[in-house]
Regions:
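Active-site neighborhood of HAD-like aspartate-dependent phosphohydrolases
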Residues: 2-47
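Short beta->alpha linker loops
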Residues: 24, 48, 52, 97-101, ...
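An amphipathic alpha-helix signature
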Residues: 26, 30, 53-58, 124, ...
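Metal-dependent phosphoesterase signature
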Residues: 39, 61-107, 112
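Asp-based, Mg2+/Mn2+-dependent phosphohydrolase catalytic module
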Residues: 1-10, 103-110, 114, 123-222
């Protein structure tokens, strides 16, 4: 697929695309697995980035010969939060920050009249914390979170939901994603997908994307 001649809308994932939060989330998940007696590594937990955990959590447990469901993991996570072992929302951590160039790209897109949206698997209560802390909320015309859709990435529903709300055609929509599941979701929705590799810590396989973006300073769509 070639890049759209006219771009009406750009839809962004959040974690690892707007906010460099994935390393923080992975470290938190190491603690949770440890509470369950599973010696998961930081690298193991990075495989959970961009996904809802229904397949990745059992896979991590299986690696160490332990059966575990996503429901059991999230119950243990709640116990860790209640015990003060981990912060409930990664966006509150001092080391959390936006990726370099994020605010500038969003301002340029909006100045050019391009609609912008945030499409994330993360639940809305957490996303709102990040948007508020980093002053991102006013920069989006649409926000779709994990608790707003029945099916998550790699299913196309999250991106289709955003495009339906904004009344835009996928042929004129660009998606920015940093995970294999997110890339597949954007492609399945019929969009042109940029595979973002701008995080210094986490670089997932985005080779299936239509184009790879290494930095927002190279972002030339607007």
């Amino acid at each position: 697929m070639s890049r759209p001649e006219r771009i009406d809308c750009v839809l962004f994932d959040c974690d690892g695309v707007l906010i460099d939060s994935e390393p923080i989330a992975a470290r938190r998940n190491v603690v949770v697995f440890g509470r369950m007696g599973i010696p998961a590594t930081f690298e193991d937990c990075l495989t959970m980035c961009g996904q809802d955990g229904k397949t990745t959590i059992p896979a991590i447990g299986a690696k160490y010969g332990i059966d575990v469901t996503a429901e059991q993991f999230f119950a243990a996570k709640r116990e860790c939060i209640d015990a003060g072992a981990i912060e409930a929302v990664s966006y509150r951590m001092p080391e959390a920050d936006t990726l370099p160039g994020v605010h500038g790209v969003l301002r340029r897109l909006r100045a050019a009249g391009v609609l912008t949206g945030l499409v994330s698997t993360t639940v809305s209560s957490h996303i709102l914390v990040g948007l508020d802390r980093f002053e991102l909320a006013p920069m989006f015309d649409c926000i779709v979170t994990g608790d707003m859709v029945e099916r998550h990435k790699p299913d196309p529903m999250p991106y289709q939901t955003a495009m339906d709300y904004l009344h835009v055609d996928p042929a004129h929509t660009v998606v920015v994603e940093d995970s294999p599941a997110g890339v597949r979701s954007g492609l399945a929705a019929g969009c042109y997908v940029l595979g973002f590799r701008g995080s210094a810590t986490v670089r997932q396989d985005v080779s299936a994307a239509n184009e790879v973006l290494d930095s927002y300073f190279d972002f030339d769509l607007a």
